[in-house]
Amino acid sequence: KTVCEKGPAAGSAFSFPHTVYNAAGGYLSIFTGLKGFCATIANGTQAGLQSVICACDELRSGAVDAVLAAGTDENSENITEVYSHLPLPGHVVGEGCVTMLLEDAAAAQARGARIYAEILGYAGTHQAARYGAEPAQEQVDRTLAEALQDAGLTAVDRLFTAQEMKARTGDARAASAALALAEACRAVSSGECRTAAALATGWTGSVSCVIVGWKEA
């Protein structure tokens, strides 16, 4: 804003680090002393879930024993204004931040940590399409199947959670995916009705799925 009003000479190079996507990861490292692998994923509504997948890949490789995986979304007046004009009936833009410590099971047990859940498997797919295009139902079905296969599970007694953009086509796709598992799933839920949908950019045609096994408290 200062540069726009007063020109380039009024800008400061020290302001730049606050404007880039990977600033949050840098601050975490500075304030906590964390070192090692660090990545920033900017992929709209898939970013938080894909950060979990990325962290799991690092854990599976054996390169690390623990990883912080985070997803954050902060709204602005501009974002709220833009999405208020999109054809998304009933859609409410949400914001917030979640950070999870993902750790190798053996390492967590060795330090006596309380284990809330176990990530059993995951998968993601992508299709080349124009900007704003909805992924085909085939991609959704494939993602679910691959995630279950990676986890070594079937849909029996699984809880299926659907997250979509509240666009009619998106809701229809989520419903279709749920119906595909309806005979086997114990329950189907969608959290957006309570939390609204947090997002950073538009749709990218990506679909992600993480199979989580919750531990008894």
Spell out what each predicted region is.
Residues G25-S29, L49-C56, R60, V98-A106, ...:
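Predominant activation on well-ordered alpha-helical scaffold segments within soluble catalytic domains
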Residues A63-H85, P89, G124-P135, T161-R194, ...:
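Acyl-CoA/ACP chain-elongation machinery
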Residues L34, G44-G48, C56-D57, V64, ...:
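Short acidic/polar capping segments at secondary-structure boundaries
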Residues Q139-L159, M165-T169, V188:
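Conserved active-site "lid/cap" helical segment
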Residues E81-L153, T195, W203-A217:
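Condensing-enzyme catalytic core mediating Claisen C-C bond formation in acyl metabolism
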Residues T19, A24, F31-T32, A70-D73, ...:
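Fold-independent oxyanion-binding glycine-rich loops
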Residues G62-A63, G112:
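Glycine-centered short loops/turns at secondary-structure junctions
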Residues T2-I53, L88-V92, A162-A180:
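Conserved catalytic cysteine-centered active-site region
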